[in-house]
Amino acid sequence: DARIIFYGAAGTGKTMTAYSLAKSLKRQVLAFDCSKILSMYVGESEKNVRKIFDTFYDLCEKTKSEPILLLNEADQFLGARSSGVTSGADQMHNQMQNIFLEQIENFKGMLIATTNLLENIDKAFSRRFNYKIEFKKPNKEQRLELWKKMIPVDEPYEKKFDVNALSDYSLTGGQINLIIKNK
């Protein structure tokens, strides 16, 4: 059993690493985008949280295997809980977080949560993760390697084209990939 947080800037490879890890372990990935779990309807977010874990355990039972549970953008609902709750919305959000906390506490399997904002995650949630792995933005040399790997070799480039100059821009791998795709 492992509960892991991958954290770092957008486009640094957190989600890609989770899928690569699953592939190397010969496991499926059951992925959820946490920003889509929150609901404006009373009680719906709590149901959505329970459904994540129920779906995971059902899949384990049906396939007789254990997928990796991937929660993308976990900071969406693992943020600091409200103290001195006054509004009904705050109460519902805290209740949803408490359910999530309980589910993580009792989770059997491998769970990977990704976030761009580790500092926004409530300390009670943070403590329940065995590992916190930072994904840093690539340095100039790493960016150069990324550009060289991603730029199609058969493209007609201008004579003055210099791939080294591209690595001067502080971009993540995800951003470089987007630039290549949208050329």
Per-range role (PLM):
Residues D168-K183:
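The conserved phosphate-sensing helix
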Residues D1-A165:
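Walker A/P-loop NTP-binding motif of AAA+ ATPase domains
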